[in-house]
């Protein structure tokens, strides 16, 4: 894949719609610790989340959105507390999962749902009934 400095280097780039991209970028930066990669005028902002990325675009927020953004983090408990202190609605508190992750779910100020996951152990899929067919 060729790289273009104007486009995030990620293979999958979720785009989240917010009525005010600047306010959204500021909020997710403060609440979830993401950083701005590139600001395009006042209507589109590319964000970095560790080695992942997503884009915030201007538009009308659709009700009953059918997406969830999963972000790999370190320290789920601390991250959850930071999100809560900055106004995130915590849907599920951090919990250990049988597949080796500690996860929590949050909703941001526009109703976007986020799943934050911290690896706590390397568990083979067959140990938790993951049914893996191809792992690299």
Where are these regions (language model features)?
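N-terminal beta-strand motif that seeds the catalytic metal site of vicinal oxygen chelate
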Residues: 1-26, 53, 67-69, 117-136
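Short secondary-structure boundary/capping segments
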Residues: 3-6, 45-46, 60-61, 96
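Conserved short beta-strand elements that form part of the metal-binding/catalytic scaffold
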Residues: 35-67, 113-118
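Vicinal oxygen chelate
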Residues: 20-22, 69-113, 120
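Positions that flank functional sites
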Residues: 43-44, 98-99, 126
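Conserved acetyl-CoA-binding loop of GNAT-fold acetyltransferases
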Residues: 30-37, 87-89
């Amino acid at each position: 894949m060729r790289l273009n400095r104007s486009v995030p280097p990620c293979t999958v780039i979720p785009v989240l719609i917010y009525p005010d991209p600047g306010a959204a970028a500021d909020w997710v930066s403060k609440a979830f610790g993401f950083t701005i990669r590139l600001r395009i005028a006042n209507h589109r902002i590319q964000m970095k989340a560790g080695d992942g990325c997503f884009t915030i675009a201007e538009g009308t927020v659709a009700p009953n959105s059918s997406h969830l953004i999963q972000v790999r983090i370190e320290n789920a408990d601390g991250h959850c507390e930071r999100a809560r202190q900055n106004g995130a609605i915590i849907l599920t508190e951090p919990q250990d999962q049988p597949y080796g992750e500690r996860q929590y779910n949050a909703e941001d100020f526009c109703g976007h749902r986020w799943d934050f996951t911290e690896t706590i152990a390397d568990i083979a899929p067959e140990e938790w009934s993951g049914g893996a067919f191809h792992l690299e």
